């Protein structure tokens, strides 16, 4: 299994450099690939900030990537929940934090908007400090 960095995923998804995109695609097609949650966070930021991906386009791209038979995600179930919540309006990083805290009794934050969103979209018992 090969762990990949953000730039490999960005080249694969955006294809803005033909040579690198081809090498990324060949690697992903021919090898088992491990993608950590931190790489997904960075990938979301790059695609949103530099390539103007909407939440729906971003979620679709990450789901398609995760659906490839050679791709393995850290906490795939949590990532799937986070992508759903992201499409419902949560920030992707916040959604991933919430999904990662699934075993916690409550989620504490000073961010009142996040606390409301956590309770509405994610059905998480959020404690606003």
Predicted regions and their residues:
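Active-site flanking residues adjacent to catalytic metal/cofactor-binding acidic residues
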Residues: 4, 41, 110
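Acidic, PIN/NYN-like endoribonuclease modules and their adjacent C-terminal/linker elements
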Residues: 1, 98-129
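Alpha-helix/helix-capping structural signal
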Residues: 7-8, 38, 112-113
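Active-site neighborhoods of divalent-metal-dependent phosphate/nucleic-acid chemistry enzymes
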Residues: 19, 68-113
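Active-site-proximal, substrate-binding regions of enzyme catalytic domains
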Residues: 42-70, 83
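Residues that scaffold the ATP/ADP-binding catalytic core of kinase and kinase-like folds
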Residues: 11-13, 46, 117
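Short, well-structured N-terminal submotif of metal-dependent ribonuclease cores
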Residues: 1-35, 50-60, 125-129
